[in-house]
Amino acid sequence: MPVKDLKAWFNELDKKLNDHNRQVAKRILIELHNRLDTLIKVGLGYLTLSRLANSLSGGESQRIQLTRSLGSNLTNSLYILDEPSIGLHSRDTTNLIKVLKELRDLGNTVVVVEHDEMMMREADHIIDMGPLASHLGGEVVATGDYDEII
């Protein structure tokens, strides 16, 4: 069952519970709804519950970790993501940016290695490592926000 269908199933379950059962399940259902909503926001509504973890792409895995992190309410943590927008439709990239900003607004530091222009436009600060930045180290060629660098 895809995540988006599971969300719909839980929405229907909420309607079917009597008052007592709804009260008993309230905290769990709130957490489930929040996590499912976040999975959908970061473009993972298509994932099925039977999907094996080792079949996920790096970007999918990172976005699942983001969902877990938002649910844990951790603050003062450092998150480092390597191109989490790979393979995303621009609508989903916009939602991913919102989720990353939520993490930041909770008091965390979010570092993203990214080449997507939309992601860079929304960054608080960019450090351009220039050519040969991969395993060769590279060097800082520009810093600032998107408009300052371009």
Which residues make up each language-model segment?
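Conserved phosphate-binding elements of NTP-dependent enzyme cores
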Residues: 1-150
